[in-house]
Amino acid sequence: MAGEMSILGSAILALFLAGYLGQQYLPPPKPKVIGIDLGTTFCSVGVFHPGLGEVEVIGDLQGRKSIPSVVSFTVSGIHSGYEGQDLADANPLNTIYDAKRFIGKLFTPEDLERESTPYQFQVLHRNGSAEFSISTNRTFTVTPEYISSRLLLNMKKMAEGHLGVLISKAVISVPADFDERQRNYTVRAANLAGLEVLRVINEPTAAAMAYGLHKVDVLNVLVVDLGGGTLDVSLLNKQGGMFLTRAMAGNNKLGGQDFNQRLLQHVFTRVHEQYGALPSHEGDIHTLRQAVEAAKLNLTFGQTSVIRVPLSLRGSAGSVVYEDVLTRQLFEDLNADLFQKILTPIEEVLREGRLDKSEVDEIVLVGGSTRIPRIRQIIAQYFGMEPNTSVDPELAVVTGVALQAGIMGGSWPLQVSAIEIPNRHLRKTNFL
């Protein structure tokens, strides 16, 4: 009997040893679940690598990790991401963006007309929902969830190409104030893209996870999410490992695109002052827009940025090469009033949450526009403390979603999950 027990014990020890050696020396399994940040202006996809315990945000073939949430329809096909964005100026009526503003929402005809005013593409009212009119070699309509499905399919294919495996499951983030219908339509979009959604997680919670706040002792977390087109400020209350979104406010018409537009308008004015004419070709306008966007990014890290763009101008001016030096101070002056608007929803969530600003334990920055030095300075001066900048703000949400995807996929080493407490009374207070 003792011999049999000894043999059994040796067998169990051998199994444990084999498992340990397997973990140490065999390649870890491929991730099975992807995490997707389906943003208003940009999308990102990430995975949690088993064994390594690391999140990887996947880039496209050019290494870009933030992909435009744009879909353009042409006679030759459907173009998503950067391909779609590149067609926006030449094909404005059939290039759809900001679909997230419409997905799952019910509108009166009057509300939809107001919401669709800024867009060149046509938005139709169908039984309370929005649809987009497309006219290529035929005329048809598409839904916001179809547009979202094309973006999600693009993320899915990027992940599959990078990992070398087929992907069928995902965790997706949504704004904390999305109601049940908006969440269901987002899941429907994922299903159209061939993805089973294991969990829908709130964007502020995902960001808090990326910063590791689900594992540390903090109570009140303020999340400032300033992306390309929207500002969302959320006040999270952490109770153990559980997050409750206590209050939310923002501005659905404020973001990096608005800052770009101010700078672009300044450049147009300078061109007109210098040459007495404006660019005439859509391609030139697109190139100038790209140059201004690049300059804005450069001014995040430096004090000056040079733009040099060949232009074809209307009238007798003809072809010229426009060159100018843009400064950070100029950029800040042009957008001073917009930057100050960020404080309004911050003050509102503190009021709704019945919290003094001194009671905020952690300030988390999300969205590429929070990289702008003046914006960080305004927030720091208001609170008298520096915001947490340990994570790339543009990738904070997708990092948190990928962590949750790893948890849902049973990846090891085991991670601490974030549990969300539903707040059925949560309503986002919008400012303009």
Regions found by a protein language model. Give the residues of each.
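An exposure/low-complexity boundary signal
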Residues: 122-127, 133
